A protein has these predicted regions:
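A residue-level marker of the well-folded mature domains of exported/periplasmic proteins
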Residues: 2-7, 24-362
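Sec-dependent signal peptide hydrophobic core
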Residues: 5-17
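Bacterial Sec-type N-terminal signal peptides, specifically the leucine/valine-rich hydrophobic h-region
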Residues: 18-22
Length: 362
């Protein structure tokens, strides 16, 4: 079986991406009200995020975006979080448009339903940046910023398959706990993972698309499969750290042994701590600072009537895809700590101090 050689990205990757961040060339439209001037009313930028169950949005995406956009000019951010409710997000978008936002940065709850938000914005000549998740069924987007989401699934799948092989597990069986079926990114994670798993000797015992990315629903699913597949679960493909946490809770409650190999994504602090403790094998680290600041830079350019460059065409939409990185116990120091995403003190709380020392995380 072909093994994946992980190329560990450190802060240099983020710096490179930031350094090559879009340079603008003048568009045909006159610039909007000067957003670099401190005089006059602030230019409003809408930021619509999808949910709060994943900690990244409130802890990282929002504050990083707001700090960057305000450093670029006289901007006010009109912010809303939809709490995984597509109808609520539609209302929030209409409210932001009524409030006079000049650019809308949208991370959709439902990729298909969000096309109507884009249509409403277009009718008012407000450009939309599709952030992290691609709005489906429309080419009326000014820009799309995300990570290579199919590659995320490939990295997760390779990590799981390779670890099972390295551990000498014969005829391994796994559960697949995918993300929300209404999240376009989750579809790509699943596709990428299957492209690896389906070619391996790993058997998928059962598979579940987790509504709303709910850790509780992931836990319930895994708990049910433990009873059905007693002694057969060698691994769990969990699409993110939230669903991984649900899987871990179910497995611990059932005292499953030997412990399965469990994947994840988002490099949440709880996910990193589970990796340190040996409860989770890996996660996917995304340089959210780079992504959020890039979105702010593009929003600034669009607000000024400029045309962002340095993009590739994806389904008719100017796109910038960033690079995801595998994190295991062995490279925590070289990734999330070195990049300043977390400090050792944040990871190595009292509960995890001994595990951190054993893993040389200090």
């Amino acid at each position: 079986m072909k093994k994946l050689g992980y190329k560990l990205a450190t802060v240099a990757v983020g710096a490179l991406l930031t350094a090559t961040t879009l340079t603008a060339c003048g568009g045909n439209n006159p610039p909007a009200a000067s957003s670099n001037s401190s005089s006059g009313p602030a230019v409003k930028i809408g930021l619509l995020l999808p949910e709060t169950k994943t900690t990244r949005y409130e802890a990282f995406d929002r504050p990083l975006f707001e700090a960057k956009i305000k450093s670029l000019g006289n901007y006010d951010v009109v912010y809303s979080n939809a709490s995984q409710d597509a109808s609520k997000q539609q209302e929030q978008a209409e409210s932001a448009l009524t409030d006079g936002v000049k650019v809308l940065v949208l991370d959709p709850v439902n990729a298909q339903a969000a096309a109507s938000i884009v249509a409403s914005a277009k009718a008012q000549d407000v450009p939309v940046i599709s952030y992290d998740r691609l709005v489906a069924g429309t080419t009326d987007l000014a820009y799309y910023i995300s990570f290579d989401n199919e590659q995320v699934g490939v990295l997760q799948g390779n990590a799981l398959v390779d670890k099972l092989a390295k551990d000498g597990v014969k005829n391994p069986g796994i559960l697949m706990v995918n993300g929300s079926p209404t999240d376009g990114n989750a579809v790509l994670f699943k596709k990428g993972a299957h492209s690896v798993i389906d070619k391996s000797d790993v058997k998928v015992l059962a598979e579940y698309d987790t509504p709303d990315w709910s850790p509780d629903k992931a836990q319930s699913f895994v708990a049910g499969q433990i009873t059905q597949f007693t002694g057969q679960i060698d691994g769990v493909y969990a699409a993110n750290d939230g669903t991984a946490g649900g899987a871990v809770a179910a497995l611990k409650a059932a005292n499953v042994s030997p412990w399965p190999i469990i994947t994840g994504q988002d490099a949440e602090i709880t996910g990193i701590q589970r990796i340190v403790a040996g409860d989770q094998y890996m996660t996917i680290y995304k340089a959210i600072k780079t992504e959020a600041e890039l979105a702010a830079t593009v929003a600034d350019q669009l607000a000024k009537g400029e045309t962002p460059s340095d993009a590739t065409d994806v389904a008719g939409v100017p796109t910038k895809l960033l690079t995801p990185v595998v994190v295991t116990k062995e490279n925590i120091m070289d990734t999330v700590v070195k990049d300043g995403f977390y400090t050792v003190a944040q990871i190595c709380t009292t509960e995890y101090a001994k595990a951190c020392a054993a893993a040389n995380i200090k």
